[in-house]
Amino acid sequence: MLLTVTDLTKTYTTADGPFAVLRGVDLTLSAGETLALTGESGSGKSTLLHLIGGLDVPDAGRIVLDGTDLTALDDAGRARMRREVVGVVFQQFNLIPSLRIADNIAFQARLAGQHDADWCATLADRMGLTPQLRKYPEQLSGGQQQRVAIARTLAPRPRLVLADEPTGNLDEATAAQVLALMLELVADTGAGLLMVTHSDRLAGQMQRRLHLRQGLIA
């Protein structure tokens, strides 16, 4: 099993007192499997992704990723897992304005010490970005920038891809096209994909679907 989440809890302190965002979440994901995570705003979807991605730590429970217990790691260990094992795509593209598209795509792979020029070129080609490689992010449309962000995430060949509304800034038809491309490329790498989405149409493109309600899997 690529990912096993067991009895995960997370509580934040608010002005009104403690707020339990996650209240004992369990899930599993196999290598090569795609899973949609749906739910209302505030149900804990993004928090769950942040915990799995090592961007935050749970109050209790376990996250075992690729044989490593993330909850037993320190900050440096979680950072290493983010570089070497996990790829993250957010709704905001967060491309580097001063870098050409070719270098934006290769950026994460170079940080991880896993840069493969041929694979980056393949990603650019499959995403329809080859004509844009010498351009800068500001010269691309929103849909093109999101394709760059996805290619950048896949460039290091992560074992697990976490996607938080990765096509949220796109219209429904374009979003479906971009997700289809992303699913093809994820399948080529054998990675697992866990995606947060509000779209029933996009969730339907995934192999499995889980629904979060008030911090629990419904």
Language model features with spans:
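Conserved switch/coupling elements of ABC/ABC-like ATPase nucleotide-binding domains
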Residues: 214-218
